Amino acid sequence: VLTGLDNRLKNAPPEDWARITILVNTQRMARRLRELFDLGPPRFLPKIQMLTDLDNFLPDGPSPPSMSGLKRRLELVSLITKLIESQPDIAAQSSCFDLADSLANLIDEMQGEAVTPEDIARLDITDQSGHWARTQQFISIAQKYISAAKSAPDPTARQRENVLKLQAHWIKNPPPHPILLVGSTGSRGTTQLLMQNIATLPQGAVILPGFDFSMPRQVWNQMMGTFTGEDHPQ
């Protein structure tokens, strides 16, 4: 990343470095980039921030703070406890916290991929009807939680809301300065959406990790199918 910026900015005014924003997906990468910049030569530094920290891009200011993980866990425990009390055969009372953690992970995945409880309820699982009926009862808890948490969304839901706001804003008002998203593979739906948005900006770029620049075009073309490319390292 640093080498590429050096090559592109070698004849640019020094203040152009300060106009660049670099979004990274881990604190470790942010620290490493800062360490490399600290090695010199002296220059203005770009802004380096986490891709989950998008508040400074939002046109209307920061979104409301997200719900804490502990509060979410306790709310899910409360909902699961009520379900178990009404149907004691569904699970042991001692499993409430484990079930809450599993349900929290499911909710994160649903919100990150924009999957609603209604989408899951419509799945046709005819060969596992008994197990599926129990699963749907827990899905109903997720539905209650998501509906009740709209005023104070958890971090995953808040991030998706921010990305959707930026998508709408950037269509009409693209940022006047370069934005680079570095090091993410887009394995999460919300991050992938952010990457797509940045890649379409006039001064946006997405830098993928481990990209094979020597791979022939025909191999890339073979990976276009949903199933033919899913196991390929690229």
Can you say where each PLM-predicted feature lies in the sequence?
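Short, glycine/acidic-rich beta->alpha junctions
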Residues: 14, 186-190
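Basic/charged alpha-beta structural segments of nucleotide/phosphate-handling enzymes
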Residues: 24-174, 189, 196, 202, ...
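Glycine-rich P-loop/Walker A and Walker A-like loops and their local beta1-loop-alpha1 context
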Residues: 1-33
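Conserved P-loop NTPase "ATPase switch" module shared by AAA+ and STAND
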Residues: 175-187
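Residue-level signal for alpha-helix termini/capping positions
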Residues: 10-14, 171, 199
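A general structural motif
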Residues: 17-19, 174-178, 201-203
